[in-house]
Amino acid sequence: MMSANSLMDYENDPEVLEKLYRNQPEKFELELSYALKQKPDSITFRIWATRLNIELSQKDDISPTLITVIGISILAGLTTRIPALFFREDWFYPRFAPFVALMAIASYFLIKNNNGYLTRLVVIFCLITICYLSLLPDWSTSSSITMLLIHLPLACWLITGIVFSNGRWQEKESRIRFIRYSGELVILSGLILIGGFGLTALTIGLFQVIGIELDDKFIETVLALGVPAIPVIGTYVYDVVLQKKIQLAATLAKIFAPLFLVLVVAFILATTVQGIPFLDDRDYLIIFNALLIVILCIALFSIVGQDQSKETFIQRCIIISLIAATVFIDLIALYAISLRLLEFGFSINRFYIWTINILILGNLIYLLVAFAYSIQNNQRTSGMIDAVTNYLPIYALWVALATFILPLVFQFQ
């Protein structure tokens, strides 16, 4: 099947491009327009565009202006803060604060891409989700609803990914770009958050000097208005200010990958000597699984963030060693959770955690197999990148089940 990736793969093969055009001329023109957005300086694509009279300017890919971003940020903050004045904060914020923040990012890309179909899709998703969240029982006494609220931001993030890719979520390159953007956004948002806390603390201190005390309501209002706006501002910084040319996530992943490898190997050696004393400790298992997810993210960003033409043998060894060691840790976690299931019986929390560990284990094994295949066929890490992008639909399916289906199956218990 022809795609923009096909055109980019055969950019330097004029015979294949001519064959693709003759077989599907309308599809070729559509994909050529998208390929031009990805590689606007490509001489080959510009020649084809001239031949087919395709507009070279990218007027349909204009990023939202700063005024628009400020408007989205203010609207997100007000949408988060004003309803909280009429509802209990412990009821409203866990349900709607992450939802509003992530849908604000989706709004940014809807404005950028100007896609009517995706706009309708997001509006329908928002209406259904708002009704769904509004009708949920109290989350503090329900394990399934607690897990729902944990997975809901991931569901919103998947919708954002579809909007980010302008509906081309099935293409590998779109998924890679979204993963890279996600890593950069987390880091940029963290930096903006730190700066915001510093500015707030400085404001409070300066007013205290002149005898004016800013109470807790001021801090709550600043947080409620400011925090939901941070991801949108971070997106604007990445997309417009930095022109997508930053690689903080990949750089940090390269720095921390060997450090976490040392940590994991040391842990494996320690458990070999000392045994596994935390099997019956729930808090330790939670920390253990959090560490597992962090290591997986480092491995994934190390894979998708690096330039394959510049990767070294040592980098490849570090990545594969980290993945292999993480498989061992995941097996320990699964063993511990399985013991708790056998000893204490079935519970919703144990089921969710056990399933998540199974999914992560499957992803890690897939990466190992892809690495072995790439070594055998001398393909560098391209096979591992495919393993990363091809596994995303499995995570998406689980997130959809955990958010919208399983709570109903468990009757919100």
Description of each model-found segment:
Residues 72-85, 129-137, 200-210, 265-274, ...:
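Membrane-embedded alpha-helical segments in integral membrane proteins
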Residues 126-132, 153-163, 183-203, 223-235, ...:
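Alpha-helical transmembrane segments of multi-pass integral membrane proteins
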Residues 92-93, 219-223, 252-256, 274-292, ...:
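Transmembrane alpha-helix entry/boundary detector in multi-pass membrane proteins
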Residues 64-81, 121-131, 394-400:
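Alpha-helical transmembrane segments
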